[in-house]
Amino acid sequence: MRTVLCYGDSNTWGYDPTTGTRLPRESRWPVRLRRALGGEWEVIAEGLNGRTAASDDPIWEGRNGATYLLPCLRTHMPLDVVVIYLGTNDVAMRYSLRAEDVAASVGRLVRIVRTSETGPDGSAPELLVVCPPPFSRVDPQYALEAEKSRELGAAFAAMCSELRCELLDLDGVAACSDLDGFHLDADGTAAVARAVEERLRRLTD
């Protein structure tokens, strides 16, 4: 059996934009992924509301994805694949990051995984970087964040090309809910699960 770790934020945790609570278990994308992969894979969901790639949140503690990643990898090792799906929270104005800075922060996570020795027999796990979809309809007060979210695709592509890692850009694959503009509804989680399944099978064939 192979093991994949899904490392992300509230969209991996399963935030429900309709209710403001958590999606039913069967509607979260890592659970959908587990069901699609069948008995071949163990799927570990490591999603946290508000998690960033590598920035300290001035309001909430423990949201920096870079500081928790290595302990997380070691907790769940050996891992065949790590899926990193972060970047949505990093475009918030309080972090003052450009799209290129967000991509570089995710690149830092890529390097942590590659030097972690948490794959089979002390190797590095395979990697899949997921670029969040652009924000959909948002309140005007988030217009700058929405604009920055539309720039992530190109920035992530450049970073993944430089680091030679697999990229899944969700722009055109899954859409954020119009209710809040940046969380996935049930249709969105289904689309993410399908796309990640396809890439996992390609990565591990």
Predicted regions and their residues:
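Acidic carboxylate-rich catalytic motifs and surrounding loops in phosphoryl-/glycosyl-chemistry enzymes
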Residues: 45-50, 170-174
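Catalytic metal-binding/acid-base residues of hydrolase active sites
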Residues: 11-12, 49, 89, 133
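Serine-esterase "nucleophile elbow" of acetyl-processing enzymes
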Residues: 1-48, 54-59, 72-74, 82, ...
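Short, solvent-exposed polar/charged micro-motifs at secondary-structure junctions
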Residues: 53-57, 177-180
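Alpha-helical cap/lid subdomain in secreted, periplasmic
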Residues: 63-205
